[in-house]
Curated annotation (Swiss-Prot):
Subunit structure, interactors included: Monomer. Directly interacts with TNFRSF1A death domain; this interaction may be supported by TRADD. In the absence of TNFRSF1A, interacts with TRADD. Independently of TNFRSF1A, interacts with the NADPH oxidase subunit CYBA.
Originating organism: Mus musculus (Mouse)
The entry's keywords: ATP-binding, Cytoplasm, Flavoprotein, FMN, Kinase, Magnesium, Metal-binding, Nucleotide-binding, Transferase, Zinc
Protein known as: Riboflavin kinase
Binding-site residues, ATP: G15, K21, T27, N29, I82, H84, Y91
């Protein structure tokens, strides 16, 4: 994908509530206008990168972009799992994301357990990839230092 790394930010909105409740893997969801403005060559699938909430620390993350076939979503979504434990929810805060690599396409699963297992595998692979020097340097990108109040797509 020519668009990677891809930088975007937007206000965290409520999703379906499945990430925490059903999967044990909480996600922060972008509003529709952020998803609708993704570059055409950013295909659906699972990606990895860096994320921060507001002006907070930058953490590793995985993000699902698409329709989540297991749940048969009718609207395209962008759901970010930040690999960090937060003390409380952060709905309404600005989420800053740098997508740096692609893991796999979206696919359906025959059970909730196999979906959870795949996501856990994605998280482990993302951790490894983000430790590589070419990805690690993006953690300190100026994108995470600029004014956090501006909602934008692109860099």
């Amino acid at each position: 994908m020519r668009s990677l790394p891809f930088f975007c930010r937007g206000q965290v909105v409520r999703g379906f509530g499945r990430g925490s409740k059903q999967l044990g893997i909480p996600t922060a969801n972008f509003p529709e206008q952020v998803v609708d403005n993704l570059p055409a060559d950013v295909s659906t699938g699972i990606y990895y990168g860096w994320a921060s909430v507001g002006s907070g620390d930058v953490h590793k993350m995985v993000v699902s972009i698409g329709w989540n076939p297991y749940y048969k979503n009718v609207k395209k979504s962008m759901e970010t799992h930040i690999i960090h434990t937060f003390k409380e929810d952060f709905y309404g805060e600005i989420l800053n994301v740098a997508i740096v690599g692609y893991l796999r396409p979206e696919k359906n699963f025959d059970s909730l357990e196999s979906l959870i297992s795949a996501i856990q595998g994605d998280i482990e692979e993302a951790k490894k990839q983000l430790d590589l020097p070419e990805h690690l340097k993006l953690k300190d990108d100026n994108f995470f230092q600029v004014s956090k109040g501006k909602i934008m797509n692109g860099h």
